Amino acid sequence: MMPRELPPVAHIEITAALLQNLVGADASTVLEIGAHHGDHTLGLLHTFPRATVHSFEPDPRAFAVHQRLIRDKRSKLYQLAIGGTNGRAEFHMSDGLPPGPVDALKRNYPKGWDQSGSLCAPTGHVEKHPWCKFTRTISVEVRTLDTWASKHAPGTIDFIWADMQGAEGALATHGAQALARTRFMYCEYSNEELYAGEPTLERLLELMPAFEIVHRLPDDVLLRNTAFAG
């Protein structure tokens, strides 16, 4: 298969209005894979007022903050990672604090930086962000997207927002059935390996041949499922 030609990077903002026009304000099922403290959860709840937003966060520090802050009944929070297996797996916890106002950072991250943890071992991330430490691992619950969705979202998935720190390949490989009934997806990508096994954007598109690029940003991509018939 010949690699698809990638469009140029667009320096635009993915706004609520853009997503509503594309996905539809009447979207009913939204997945947020990598929810952190819930900032994007709030945005998704606002953007899609009729949707149930299913959010996944395996880091217990971030999960606790999300659980405390997000009270909307349409928000469903799961303390597990979406990955390439069903069961438990090693999760690499991030730590440290980035450059910036120390007092404010300590208030926001009292237990350390909880935003870069991954099922994938950090590689280039260590050199690119030397302040971010990975000194410990924990065991977390993991489900493949197909396994989770077969029980909790068996119909159309309107939109997936994925921030998986290098595990996007596992999402695509072990979520093919769920992705076949997913209309739109927004996810991070990196063309330099920051985590072990992290796919480039070109490789990610090879794993998801039905999806085309709507907007390519410097580190994120908005995708449309061209084969979706629902």
Which residues make up each language-model segment?
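Phosphate/nucleotide-binding beta-alpha loop and adjacent structural elements of enzyme active sites
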Residues: 1-230
